[in-house]
Amino acid sequence: MFEWIADPEAWISLVTLAALEIVLGIDNIIFINILVGRLPERQRQSGRILGLALAMLTRILLLMSLAWIMKLTAPLFTVFNQEISGRDLILLIGGLFLIIKSSGEIKEAINHQEHHESESKNKVSYLGVLIQIAVLDIVFSLDSVITAVGMASHLPVMILAIMIAVGVMMFAAKPIGDFVDTHPTLKILALAFLVLVGISLIAESLDIHIPKGYIYFAMGFSVVVEMINIRMRRLMK
């Protein structure tokens, strides 16, 4: 079980995989922060930690169910000459959920009224938020687990890389969430990014591959432009 410790390639895989898991977890952090942002202030930090803990647990359970994951790629049925597998269905449903949820959040932000926000926050339950996080964690975990399987040959290395990545994300989640909450335009940008991720998940379910690098580059470029705008607005005050 621990023979990988003496293998230099295993350590290289561990570092590389942990870094990739952090990058692949960015959309997960954004989604969790958007959801816990609707909770009362005192519950937000515990919501973030529990949400990321659920993400880690989901990834580890999926890793330990590798045989089941491999079966998900087997065709279940065919629609218009397109073979549909279990993985495709999960990605399709997850993508639709992300688009609907994020679009609803954008609409609410545009039609924002203080009394309406207050009412909506009271309607959101802690358990309800955790259930939504758990459901989307399954979708977000698929890419993460498939990447882990493709990059490392030792299960302990994969699990350790995921634990390191989630640990880093737990520290980063609050500062990112607070910063996004302080700048409403960044929140809209984050929600638009989640819509884009939802579209890419649906495309992936239809065997149309959109490189994630393109999505992350577009998001990164947009964030840089928005940071310049924020800086300019501060200087003009």
From Swiss-Prot:
InterPro entries: Integral_membrane_TerC (IPR005496). It holds the Pfam family TerC. The keyword Transmembrane applies. It comes from the Bacteria. Signal peptide: none annotated. Belongs to the UPF0053 family. This is UPF0053 protein HI_0056.
